[in-house]
Amino acid sequence: MAESAIARLRAWSDPRPGEGSLVEIDLFCLDGRLEVGDVLGTAVTPDGIEHAIRGEVLEVRFFDHMIDGLDPVFSGRVLCTGNLGPLREGWDVVASRP
């Protein structure tokens, strides 16, 4: 699998009622862009510790915005399913394209 994106998690929802492990996460991409079908495989804490997670991106809604006057970055919400384990706000998520 090729790396497709690195994104920083801003917030995430509890699983939707009746939809099992379906979760909506709010993030901005630090590198690349997430697409439907991408696999979330690694979460990295701010101090560099990696955690294995497993999720598949089911839906992506992106918009461009500025961060501290820098170039626009892709930001938005991702609907995904899987075992996101210990994922927390502020962690980076590495996605791969199968």
Segments and roles (model prediction):
Residues 35-36:
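Short coil-to-beta strand junction motifs in C2/discoidin
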Residues 2-28, 39-98:
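Beta-strand/loop-dominated core regions that host nucleotide or nucleotide-derived cofactor-binding catalytic loops
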